A protein has these predicted regions:
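Terminal low-complexity/charged segments
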Residues: 1-163
Length: 163
C-alpha cells in the first residue's frame, strides 16, 4: 500500500495535518482531535487497518500540550499508520480525550495506563479509575515531565550502603 495515496484519500474526507513518512511501510498523520474517531473508523472499516498496535503519549510541557499517537496496522498490506492528535495539558488536574474503547476494545487498557502515568482522562472508558500499575499512588503522574524523579526517590527510598 502506498501511504501517500492513502493520505490523499483520507485528506479528501478529513481535515488532516502533515504526513510524515518514516519509512516505506510506516507514516504518521497529524489531525485535529475531533476528527480522530471518524478517521480511525474509516481506516479500520475501509482501509484494512484492523489492529491497534499501541496508544502512547508525549508530554510537550513547553507547549502546554500532550501528543497522543494511535498506531494502527494493516497486516494484509504489511504497513502501519500513526495518527497524532494534540490535546491541552492543564497545569493541574487531568487532560481529557475521547475514549475509543468502543472502536477498539483493547484501547481501554492503553487508556488506563495513560490516565495513571500521564493524567489523561478518557471519559466512559471501562475500569479507568482502578489502579493499573501504581497501587496507591498519590503524587503527580510519573510520566509527566514536571515529575521530579530524583526528589521522589530520595523521599521514598533509603540510601543503600556502598552507593
Amino acid at each position: 500500500m502506498n501511504l501517500s495515496d492513502l493520505y490523499n484519500r483520507l485528506k479528501a474526507l478529513f481535515p488532516l495535518g502533515e504526513l510524515t513518512e518514516q519509512r516505506p511501510a510506516l507514516a504518521f498523520i497529524t489531525l485535529p482531535a475531533e476528527f480522530l474517531r471518524p478517521t480511525l473508523r474509516h481506516l479500520r472499516d475501509r482501509e484494512g487497518f484492523t489492529h491497534l498496535v499501541l496508544l502512547t503519549a508525549v508530554d510537550w510541557i513547553e507547549e502546554g500540550r500532550f501528543q497522543l499517537t494511535y498506531l494502527l496496522s494493516n497486516r494484509t498490506q504489511a504497513c502501519d499508520i500513526g495518527l497524532r492528535v494534540m490535546i491541552d495539558r492543564p497545569a493541574s488536574g487531568l487532560a481529557t480525550m475521547d475514549s475509543i474503547h468502543d472502536v477498539w476494545p483493547t484501547a481501554a487498557t492503553y487508556q488506563r495506563e495513560l490516565r495513571e502515568m500521564f493524567g489523561i482522562d478518557f471519559p466512559g472508558s471501562p475500569r479507568l479509575h482502578e489502579d493499573f500499575i501504581l497501587e496507591g499512588w498519590n503524587d503527580i503522574p510519573p510520566y509527566r515531565r514536571d515529575f521530579d524523579t530524583l526528589k521522589y526517590a530520595e523521599a521514598s527510598f533509603n540510601q543503600r550502603p556502598g552507593r
